[in-house]
Regions:
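Alpha-helical assembly-interface signal, strongest on the long, hydrophobic N-terminal helix that forms
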Residues: 2-81
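Short, conserved structural patches
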Residues: 2-3, 51-163
Length: 163
């Protein structure tokens, strides 16, 4: 039978304590990877949806609603963006602004509330925003109210399409 050393009694259970500390660090890193992975997925999807909306917008095309009726250009752009972003976020959570930009490519006043698809040849901007709430307070604690606003935009020139 092996004899316990002088410190044998004091080291009893130290393995489980070390494992618990290592597990805590590992789980924290795993949660952070999942949280930020989801955040980047939403950002990428929002950028993709914005690009899809601008592609439709710049050629002056429209889409049909579910019952087959043609939609306006603005509604077509909004629907395209919401459909393309629906995998990552609720479609109604995406805030969409469509507006003409000035010659200096500056934003007009109150651009957040504008939805105007513009005329042929106009320089336009589509800006989308969504508020992301983190799943865990562990990561959310680093952000105000545990949320962050993700934004994507596309600037383009309308082609000289027939209206």
């Amino acid at each position: 039978m092996a004899r316990q050393g002088r410190y044998g009694r004091m080291s009893r259970g130290s393995t489980i304590v070390e494992f618990a500390i290592a597990l805590l660090v590992f789980v924290t890193l795993l949660v952070a990877i999942i949280e930020f992975g989801w955040l980047f997925f939403i950002q990428h999807t929002l950028q993709y949806a914005t690009r899809e909306g601008t592609r439709l917008a710049l050629v002056g095309r429209t889409v049909n609603d579910p019952s087959g009726n043609p939609m306006t250009r603005v509604d077509s752009i909004i629907r395209t963006i919401r459909d393309a972003s629906s995998l990552a976020v609720r479609p109604d959570a995406v805030l969409i602004s469509i507006y003409p930009v000035s010659a200096s490519f500056g934003d007009p006043a109150n651009w957040e509330n504008i939805q105007d698809a513009g005329e042929p040849g106009d320089y336009m901007r589509v800006r989308t925003r969504v508020v992301h709430t983190f799943f865990t307070p562990l990561i959310g604690g680093f952000f105000p109210d545990g949320r962050i606003t993700l934004q994507a935009e596309g600037t383009y020139r309308n082609e000289l399409f027939d209206e």
